[in-house]
């Protein structure tokens, strides 16, 4: 009897230990068989400087298992012949708000000059100004957005670093995968970077009302956080200042709208010993030597200006020469930045229509940007600058199985993304087996010459 009870107890404990490894819930039976896929005979772009011809890629579940040529494969592996196709690492966008709550403006603090509002509406032991919110943690707000994820996957992205784009001090970000998995699986890393800007955003308080006020508020917050940390909160608790000090250990990203902002941001950083990664306004070419001297990483937008309407002489007379010059020179900004030796990455966040991404990228390449620099700006550069290259950025054993299958060189005109694999999950973008029917044909009708 005791022996039977012991065996039953052992069986129960064994089952519990297995199920205890599973954290998130799932309806139905879990399939724990390893999912091996082998992609062979493809041109594999392991990273921007390494390309393997007629190579093999083996993945297991959500990770890369092996990259090379003609190696032994596990039993039960699904083999996919990709002869003539190309494989690239999926792209990374480190300046996104994917999966973040929609920002909605509340009443008050705007528009009526005579209604001055100085107190914060936010309850709790937080900063006195609503535009200062370092306590915001993107990982706690992240929810999978299927529609937005699909838009990004179609243009080659597999991972995003997201934060709430609101306020002068915006809190920290989260690294997420663009898979269809639940948040528990899609969330890859919390507390990736801290974020700042000169825009007060949705704050309903009157102050600040100018760029000068925004700079003053940020500087005062830095001084306050330093004082608060040194006094060890001897007088009162302030959760915002505590979070601000904690976030200083993270890579810091500052949103700028022009080269003027970039120079201004660096000046603030030097005052307090902070090296900011700068979200560029796309006009760095105007002061390239000064920007290069900052020795920082730039996040470049691809929202180049549309052609100006100058057909009507009256309309043309109202177009500023500076606007015409920027329209002509903006597509060359990435190439100029690369030629100067400035480290940079790209973001698609400023594009109203995400489908225009490759059109804009092609414009940058035609203006002189090399394919190597373009791929670096979408893969290894963003991964390294935010220290997430242990998970994404290249096709390497142990990293996430985030990769693209394309019909040819991805930076050639009219190239197609056929599949985007994210965390080992296949997303079909274009039918890989579709027959190409474009070409010149001769029609023959019986009885006619």
Q: How should these model regions be labeled?
A:
Residues 1-26:
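Bacterial Sec-dependent N-terminal signal peptides
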Residues 144-283, 416, 422:
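Polyanionic/metal-chelating signatures
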Residues 25-31, 44-56, 68-69, 355, ...:
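Acidic, glycine-enriched loop/beta-strand segments at the rims
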Residues 33, 41, 104, 111-124, ...:
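His/Asp/Glu-enriched, well-ordered alpha-helical/loop segment
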Residues 163, 232-330, 344-345, 366, ...:
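Active-site core of metal-dependent hydrolases
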Residues 22-24, 29-35, 44, 48-90, ...:
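Histidine-rich, glycine-flanked metal-binding segment
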Residues 37-43, 433-449:
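Tryptophan-anchored aromatic micro-motifs
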């Amino acid at each position: 009897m005791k022996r039977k009870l012991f065996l039953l107890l052992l069986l129960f404990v064994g089952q519990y230990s297995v199920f205890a490894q599973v954290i998130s819930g799932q309806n139905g039976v879990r399939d724990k068989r390893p999912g091996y896929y082998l992609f062979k005979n493809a041109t594999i772009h392991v990273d921007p400087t390494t390309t393997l011809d007629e190579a093999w890629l083996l993945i297991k579940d959500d990770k890369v298992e092996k990259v090379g040529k003609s190696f032994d494969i596990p039993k039960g592996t699904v083999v996919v012949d990709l002869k003539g196709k190309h494989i690239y690492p999926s792209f990374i966008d480190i300046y996104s708000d994917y999966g973040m709550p929609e920002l909605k403006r509340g009443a008050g603090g705007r528009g009526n000059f005579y209604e001055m509002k100085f107190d914060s509406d936010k309850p709790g032991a937080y900063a006195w100004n609503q535009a200062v919110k370092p306590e915001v943690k993107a990982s706690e707000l992240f929810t999978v957005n299927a529609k937005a994820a699909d838009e990004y996957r179609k243009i080659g992205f597999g991972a995003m670093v997201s934060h709430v784009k609101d306020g002068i001090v915006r809190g920290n970000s989260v690294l997420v995968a663009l898979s269809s998995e639940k948040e528990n699986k899609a969330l890859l890393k919390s507390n990736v970077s801290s974020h700042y800007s000169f825009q007060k955003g949705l704050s309903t308080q009157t102050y600040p009302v100018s760029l000068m006020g925004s700079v003053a508020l940020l500087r005062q917050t830095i001084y306050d956080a330093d004082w608060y940390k040194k006094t060890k909160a001897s007088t009162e608790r302030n959760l915002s200042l505590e979070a601000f000090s904690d976030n200083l250990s993270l890579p810091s990203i500052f949103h700028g709208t022009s080269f003027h902002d970039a120079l201004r941001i660096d000046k603030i950083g030097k005052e307090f010993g902070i090296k900011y990664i700068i979200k560029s306004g796309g006009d760095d070419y105007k002061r390239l030597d000064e920007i290069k001297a900052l020795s920082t990483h730039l996040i470049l937008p691809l929202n180049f200006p549309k052609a100006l309407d100058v057909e009507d002489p009256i309309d043309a007379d109202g177009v500023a020469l500076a606007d015409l010059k920027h329209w002509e020179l903006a597509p060359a900004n990435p190439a100029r930045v690369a030629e100067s030796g400035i480290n940079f990455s790209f973001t698609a966040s400023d594009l109203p229509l995400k489908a225009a991404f490759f059109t804009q990228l092609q414009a940058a390449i035609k203006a002189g940007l090399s394919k190597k620099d373009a791929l670096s700006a979408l893969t290894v550069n963003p991964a390294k600058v935010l220290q997430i290259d242990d998970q994404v950025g290249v096709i390497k054993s142990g990293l996430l199985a985030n990769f693209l299958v394309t019909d040819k060189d991805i930076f050639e005109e009219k190239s197609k993304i056929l599949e985007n694999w994210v965390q080992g999950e296949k997303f079909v973008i274009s039918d890989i087996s579709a027959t190409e029917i474009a070409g010149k044909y001769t029609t023959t009708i019986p009885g006619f010459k």
